[in-house]
Amino acid sequence: LDRRDWRVNANANQDYSLGGLILNTSGKVVANYWLDEVFHPDAGRAHREGDLHIHDLDMLSGYCAGWSLRQLLAEGFGGVPGTISSTPPRHLSSACGQIVNFLGTLQNEWAGAQAFSSFDTYLAPFVRLDSLTYEQVEQTLQEFVFNLNVPSRWGTQTPFTNLTFDWVCPADLRDQYPFIGGEPVDFTYGDLQEEMDLINRAFIAVIGAGDADGRPFTFPIPTYNITADFDWDSPN
């Protein structure tokens, strides 16, 4: 409570709160289980004596995970016992909402980052189908980023999220037809470079602006695929 233990400040994503107190307290029980029952006694002793440090002992779970955004958008978010289920999204706003719900839910089962790849490629069809303007895309992505930065995971933490952007449609997807709302559309992912550009430009604008106080967003952490056909001269 008086924050004298160094471990209170070990996680920059966790603030002083009731949720943080609960996580820190229960985490010590879990950490002792790891050291006594899972790791070799020599490893447990080495950690306790400061010879080495084993990270994230507070969580009896895997570390990081990557998921299929294409599968989520094709099937909708569901299958989690005791929670609501969604049909496949038909619009950019509902797609972003399901991504937030998915990442927030799965984050509670993992210690580290949750990631989606090809974010711009897989969301571009929604921009095309609804003929969205740049302003509409930017507004939707602003809501998306703000929602991802709500402290909704255990310990009053923000979900640790990572998104990979292709910038240019990958060769293995260029001739494939998206399924939106469970139905195929009459264009391929390779036809959507203009829509991908809108998404990338809007996302960078939102991340660059920060929140209402100008504070930078912690998440999602963006990763860009730098391939041989990367457009270095893009206006974005």
What annotation goes with each model-predicted range?
Residues 1-236:
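Conserved catalytic cores of very large enzyme subunits
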